[in-house]
């Protein structure tokens, strides 16, 4: 009988650190029996995404290392400490074989708690430029999976590094054009231009493209993912 692989995923705050982890969970499940748990933020969009994938979700406190003045800089160290303590509790209770993170400050104290317990930590780097959270987790990580070869240079101290390409769920490759045309009321003939700054949109991108839309709409059918709450600004 195959041993069940226990995997603790950490990340969130936005869709960026969440969707690669869901893809990894899906891929591992196809290889053999797995049991997963996800530690995320208390206010990010990841809880709905994780629970929809059938993974138990637990919110833990998260701080942020800001490089600018904010009153939250005085309280965030306590949030980070609390996140580490609660993360340690989950590690001791769940006893994962491996911890997997794709970024986000909520993951940092969990990564170091895992290292203290001797649990391997796998880091996913899906952007060209590593964020601060991933750079902070690098010393606690046993292995790195990266998309862009240029980003590997920032993680030379991680002993195992592997170019994995895009980490996406199978459903992305199984899209149905006819269903998309019906949902967005598209004509199947003209090309479609998708504008997105990620799951939360990007205010700068949203505003920058406004003068260009009339010209683009002469040649393309435009789908603009603005991010939740950003549509009113357009």
Can you name each region flagged by the protein language model?
Residues 17-29:
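Short amphipathic alpha-helix
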Residues 28-37, 94, 216-221:
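A generic structural motif
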Residues 69-98:
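An amphipathic, basic-hydrophobic alpha-helix
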Residues 115-178:
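Active-site-proximal region of nucleotide-activated glycan assembly enzymes
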């Amino acid at each position: 009988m195959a041993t069940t692989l226990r995997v603790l995923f950490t990340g969130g705050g936005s869709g960026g650190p969440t969707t690669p982890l869901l893809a990894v969970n899906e891929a591992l499940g196809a290889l053999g029996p797995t049991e997963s748990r996800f530690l995320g933020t208390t206010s990010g969009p990841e809880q709905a995404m994780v629970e929809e994938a059938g993974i138990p979700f637990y919110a833990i406190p998260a701080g942020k290392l800001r490089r600018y003045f904010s009153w939250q800089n005085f309280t965030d160290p306590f949030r980070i400490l609390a996140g580490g303590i609660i993360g340690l509790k989950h590690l001791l209770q769940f006893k994962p074989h491996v911890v997997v993170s794709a970024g986000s400050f909520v993951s940092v104290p969990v990564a170091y708690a895992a290292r203290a317990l001797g649990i391997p930590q796998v880091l996913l780097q899906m952007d060209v430029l590593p964020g601060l959270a991933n750079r902070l987790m690098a010393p606690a990580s046993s292995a790195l999976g990266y998309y862009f070869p240029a980003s590997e240079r920032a993680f030379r101290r991680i002993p195992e590094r592997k170019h994995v390409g895009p980490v996406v769920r199978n459903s992305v490759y199984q899209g149905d054009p006819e269903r998309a045309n019906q949902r967005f009321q598209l004509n199947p003939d003209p090309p479609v231009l998708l504008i997105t700054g990620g799951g939360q949109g990007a205010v700068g991108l949203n505003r920058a493209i406004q003068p260009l839309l009339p010209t683009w709409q002469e040649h393309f059918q435009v789908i603009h993912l603005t991010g939740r709450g950003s549509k009113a600004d357009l």
